């Protein structure tokens, strides 16, 4: 694990202990089960939404709702998650990815709830999931999918967390950065596989990360390239290599209107 991931995971363990002393796992489970019976809050089908776009010949874009990052600081001063969500939906996003980590990304659960309430597209809870408590919490706040980062987890942990997510109707995006992590990710059932082009040790970004791992990704997986997609040329490079799902954040967060930036990048 990288230094920054070590710090984040250590913080996350403290956060989970603190949160579970305030709201029990049982309470989150009850809310999650109630949400699953609610027309407004039942899962919207995160993977399906991406695959629908791809089947229609379009890019399946997961658009990020992110106020700040450890490497870049504040990305967007005028940050209203509901408005950002509506702008993305209007301009053709498949899904949203909402940062809920407070210590490193200045996110919160309310941003996810506000974004989801403002649109009809599915929402990924973008956080550092290390404990089943967070998965019940994710469904309780209305998330449609969760993220599992291989660099943060042992294989047996990932399998337990994935099973918990699927039991609640949540889709899972599993994220890797290198070949050993990819090998572990392929042990999971989820068809949704993200390759992060950002090295979490150095924060350097290279699109070659996705391209170099491409031949090892089975055809039955939906591959999402994450980070570093900043230009039309980047999009065209990926689509030329039959990569049609993208997770994009920073490029949109810095734009005056995130949705307009989305439609320009994926025109």
UniProtKB/Swiss-Prot annotation:
PANTHER family: INDOLE-3-GLYCEROL-PHOSPHATE SYNTHASE, TRYPTOPHAN BIOSYNTHESIS PROTEIN. It comes from Polynucleobacter asymbioticus (strain DSM 18221 / CIP 109841 / QLW-P1DMWA-1). One of its GO terms (molecular function) is phosphoribosylanthranilate isomerase activity. It comes from the Bacteria. Pathway: Amino-acid biosynthesis; L-tryptophan biosynthesis; L-tryptophan from chorismate: step 4/5. Keywords: Amino-acid biosynthesis, Aromatic amino acid biosynthesis, Decarboxylase, Lyase, Tryptophan biosynthesis. Belongs to the TrpC family. The keyword S-adenosyl-L-methionine does not apply. The keyword DNA damage does not apply. The gene is trpC. One of its GO terms (biological process) is L-tryptophan biosynthetic process. It catalyses: 1-(2-carboxyphenylamino)-1-deoxy-D-ribulose 5-phosphate + H(+) = (1S,2R)-1-C-(indol-3-yl)glycerol 3-phosphate + CO2 + H2O. InterPro entries: Aldolase_TIM (IPR013785), Indole-3-glycerol_P_synth (IPR045186), Indole-3-glycerol_P_synth_dom (IPR013798), Indole-3-GlycerolPSynthase_CS (IPR001468), RibuloseP-bd_barrel (IPR011060). It is an enzyme of class 4 (lyase). This is Indole-3-glycerol phosphate synthase. NCBIfam families: PRK00278.1-6, PRK00278.2-4. Its EC number is 4.1.1.48.
């Amino acid at each position: 694990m990288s230094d920054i991931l070590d710090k984040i995971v250590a913080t996350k363990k403290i956060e989970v202990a603190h949160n579970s002393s305030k709201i029990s796992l049982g309470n989150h489970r009850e809310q999650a089960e109630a949400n699953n019976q609610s027309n407004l809050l039942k899962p919207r089908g995160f993977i399906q939404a991406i695959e629908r776009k791809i089947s229609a010949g379009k890019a399946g874009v997961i658009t990020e709702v992110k106020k700040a990052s450890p490497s870049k600081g504040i990305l967007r001063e005028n940050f209203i998650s509901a408005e950002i969500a509506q702008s993305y939906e209007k301009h053709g996003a498949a899904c949203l990815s909402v940062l809920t980590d407070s210590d490193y990304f200045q996110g919160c659960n309310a941003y996810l709830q506000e974004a989801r309430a403002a649109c009809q597209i599915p929402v990924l809870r973008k956080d550092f999931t290390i404990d089943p408590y967070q998965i019940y919490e994710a469904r309780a706040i209305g998330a449609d999918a969760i993220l599992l980062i291989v660099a943060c987890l042992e294989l047996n942990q990932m399998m337990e967390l994935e099973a918990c997510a699927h039991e609640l109707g949540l889709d899972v995006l599993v994220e890797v950065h290198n070949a050993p992590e990819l090998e572990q990710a392929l042990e999971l059932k989820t068809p949704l596989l993200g390759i992060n082009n950002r090295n979490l040790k150095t924060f350097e970004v290279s699109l070659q990360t996705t391209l170099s791992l491409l031949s090892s990704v089975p055809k039955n997986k939906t591959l999402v390239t994450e980070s570093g997609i900043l230009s039309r040329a980047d999009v065209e490079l990926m689509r030329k290599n039959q990569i049609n799902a993208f997770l994009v954040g920073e490029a949109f967060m810095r734009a005056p209107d995130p949705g307009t930036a989305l439609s320009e990048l994926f025109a």
